[in-house]
């Protein structure tokens, strides 16, 4: 019986939410292990649409335990707002089915303000963050001045911790020409929220260890994508956390041996939000058409996603850096009807052919894709639930992707609906 880690194999927005929800039916526990409320996902269940940002997908399934791990940065107000919205849709959320790591780092309003100030000041050099305070919160965590959930349980020592945090942030704000923050206001806000947050607090590493020893199935839910990893992504156009599969262990307090099967999610084409290199980007009518068909707009921000052909070089690289055992290929139906589709099989960099994305920012911007043209298919793949329902040419496309990235397709998604999924290999039984 394997635990399963789900990671994005591209730049995020690959359809992880649907796949995690589909897998969560077989899991006992669903765990978020990195990121914050900057990476939203949409789930469609029985015709009802749910939009999640911070909460694990497991909250939508009765009898499942959802967990937010220590690797997440946690915005208390965003959490309370999301819980209220889901409860309004009839979703039961309480400490009975949701636990939050007591040592999770909190995102405060000052983090959001700093994030926005930096992005706006950078102008053309902006990274393209969601301005939700994710990066500044991780900075405070590494700088050992962050406020953590457990700190709200001791209001006697909390003022000292707030003062230590503000010694840093007020110095920054003075330099940016912004008014200083009053420690009393932060203390009042956190004190007011504490009774609503602390009932969820848990020693998550211990909880998960106990559950694992009991034989419970654990599903680790990654946010964003491996190409946004702060170390292995397209730096500096990345997020502020590690998004590769190994973070599932660090971000929950479980040992690497508990991780198990790694499932990488990727679209049948490529998208990216925000700035940064994108070798296969299509700025023509085809790119626009893919975006229209795929409804490529951010769940949280509404930002338009950049679209391009499938990049086998990048996905192959992610397969290696994440140790991916199988892929879940999504949105194959978006390519229905094209006369032909292109797949990037390599790059040219300064006249030389290479089979990987270099780490340097300048080199990443200069690489040129080498394409292989594959015949398209006219018959629809949408809503298919078996290989027999797929056009022969669509199957050839999937098989070619497997060859190029060196990894089998374990799941194939043909619509946003949970049931429209073709299972090749069950990750929990691999």
Swiss-Prot record:
EC code: 6.3.4.4
Co-factor remark: Binds 1 Mg(2+) ion per subunit.
Species this chain originates from: Rhodopseudomonas palustris (strain TIE-1)
Oligomer and partners: Homodimer.
Entry GO MF terms: adenylosuccinate synthase activity; GTP binding; magnesium ion binding
GO cellular component, one term: cytoplasm
Protein name per Swiss-Prot or TrEMBL: Adenylosuccinate synthetase
Catalytic activity, as annotated: IMP + L-aspartate + GTP = N(6)-(1,2-dicarboxyethyl)-AMP + GDP + phosphate + 2 H(+)
Cofactor requirement: Mg(2+)
HAMAP family, A to Z: Adenylosucc_synth
């Amino acid at each position: 019986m394997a635990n399963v880690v789900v990671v994005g194999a591209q730049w995020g927005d690959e359809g992880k939410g649907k796949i995690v929800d589909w897998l969560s039916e077989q899991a006992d526990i669903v765990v978020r292990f990195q990121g914050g409320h900057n990476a939203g996902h949409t789930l469609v269940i029985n015709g009802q649409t749910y939009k999640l940002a911070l909460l694990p997908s497991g909250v939508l399934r009765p009898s499942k335990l959802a967990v937010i791990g220590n690797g997440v940065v946690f915005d208390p107000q965003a959490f309370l707002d999301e819980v209220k919205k889901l409860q309004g849709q009839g979703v039961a959320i309480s400490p009975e089915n949701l636990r939050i790591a007591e040592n999770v780092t909190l995102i405060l309003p000052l983090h959001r303000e700093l994030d926005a100030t930096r992005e706006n000041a950078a102008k053309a050099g902006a990274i393209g963050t969601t301005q939700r305070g994710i990066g500044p919160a991780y900075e405070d965590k590494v700088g050992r001045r962050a406020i953590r959930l457990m700190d709200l349980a001791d209001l006697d020592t909390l003022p000292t911790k707030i003062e230590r945090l503000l010694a840093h942030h007020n110095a920054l704000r003075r330099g940016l020409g912004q008014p200083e923050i009053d420690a009393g206001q932060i203390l009042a806000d956190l004190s007011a929220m504490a009774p609503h947050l602390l009932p969820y607090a848990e020693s998550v590493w211990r909880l998960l260890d106990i559950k694992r020893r009991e034989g419970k199935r654990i599903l680790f839910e990654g946010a964003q994508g491996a190409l946004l990893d702060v170390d292995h992504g397209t730096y500096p156009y990345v997020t502020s956390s590690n998004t590769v599969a190994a973070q599932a262990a660090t971000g929950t307090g479980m040992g690497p041996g508990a991780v198990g099967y790694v499932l990488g999610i990727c679209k049948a084409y490529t998208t990216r939000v925000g700035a940064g290199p994108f070798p296969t980007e299509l700025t023509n009518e085809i790119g626009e058409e893919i975006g229209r068909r795929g409804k490529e707009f951010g769940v949280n921000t509404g930002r338009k996603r950049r679209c391009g052909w499938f990049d086998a070089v990048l996905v192959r690289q992610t397969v290696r850096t994440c140790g991916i055992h199988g892929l879940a290929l999504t949105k194959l139906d978006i390519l229905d009807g094209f006369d032909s589709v292109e797949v990037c099989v390599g790059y040219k960099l300064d006249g030389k052919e290479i089979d990987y994305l270099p780490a340097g920012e300048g080199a990443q911007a200069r690489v040129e894709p080498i394409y292989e043209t594959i015949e398209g298919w006219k018959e629809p793949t949408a809503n298919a639930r078996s290989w027999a329902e797929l056009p022969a040419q669509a199957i050839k496309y999937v098989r070619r992707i497997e060859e190029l990235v060196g990894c089998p397709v374990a799941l194939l998604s043909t619509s946003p609906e949970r049931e429209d999924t073709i299972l090749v290999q069950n990750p929990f039984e691999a």
